[in-house]
Amino acid sequence: MAAYIIRRLLFMVPTMFGIMLVAFVVVQFAPGGPVEQVIAKLTGSDTGATSRISGSSGGDFGNRGLAQGASQVDAATSKYRGAQGLDPEFIKKLETQFGFDKPAPERFALMLWNYLRFDFGKSYFRDVSVLQLVKEKLPVSMSLGIWMTLLTYLISIPLGIRKAMDDGSRFDMWTSTVIIIGYAIPGFLFAILLIILFAGGSFFDWFPLRGLVSENWSQLPWWHKILDYFWHLTLPIIAMALSAFATMTLLTKNSFLEEIRKQYVLTARAKGCTKNQVLYGHVFRNAMLIVIAGFPSAFVHAFFTGSLLIETIFSLDGLGLLGFESVLNRDYPVVFATLYIFSLIGVVVNLISDLTYTWIDPRIDFETREV
């Protein structure tokens, strides 16, 4: 097992390198970098379709004093669109500040060296370290990921067991219909539907539309703080849990059905064991292997992929919304740092998931690839 863990840890190096290399190459060919973002704001031009969405985050950059170098000369030429009216020296100053005065391979190597030391630098437009930004946004995304995963498991496992025990019944058929319909609805579309129905859209005004807590949260008694916290989380968690709920329920059902049909179940029943004794004394442990072992990866999936659109729709200031705004604003330090952190956590959690299999079922041996 130790050799397997070491191999997996060593395999993380080329995996992380490949992820960062692909992202870096894609960014090099993407139109509109941070320099063009600043130029567009100084000249009043539009850099693309996302400029109206990305907000005014570039305004903070202009307040640093670089805007004073934006003197106009008629003869200036530049590789940047909209920069013909700006001083070339000012353009060079922008390139130096953003690090684009160096060739791409040198910038990539420097980025990898800094990331190995967990030095992610500062945001281009917020004048705050990337780690500080991540620490500020992490609690929101953690709250969504943890509660969504727990809710999914608490409902899906009992429901999946019930469906397996009543396989082919009316209960199994209508619950499967509801689950499939729920799985087919995209999470962001379901979130919008919840807002329309329950957040003051057109029908009921039962839940808040935005934020993780109320503005007067610090003034509330402790028990009211808890209620207010879950009041704000209700709709986002339901929207995120829809697709995961369907997947986990069907996975649990199929796992139990596979175990129930095995020979040892018939042997246990022949020895006089009751239905519950067979189910919870023999079947449950084996059937729950794949379900429990998948908990870390399910949490990471909810934490990283499910929260992006949900945080944006419900205006929750978490890592998903931070990454979305950073991509629009071409805030590359934040984009690459969040990608690096998410990818690193992802590969580590995948290793933990594999090790969880061996902890639940010692018969599994990754060295020989046998069970």
List each language-model region with its residue ranges.
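Internal alpha-helical transmembrane segments
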Residues: 1-29
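Cytoplasmic juxtamembrane interface segments
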Residues: 3, 47, 62-85, 158-182, ...
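Membrane-water interface segments at the C-terminal ends of transmembrane alpha-helices
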Residues: 23-29, 92, 179-211, 232, ...
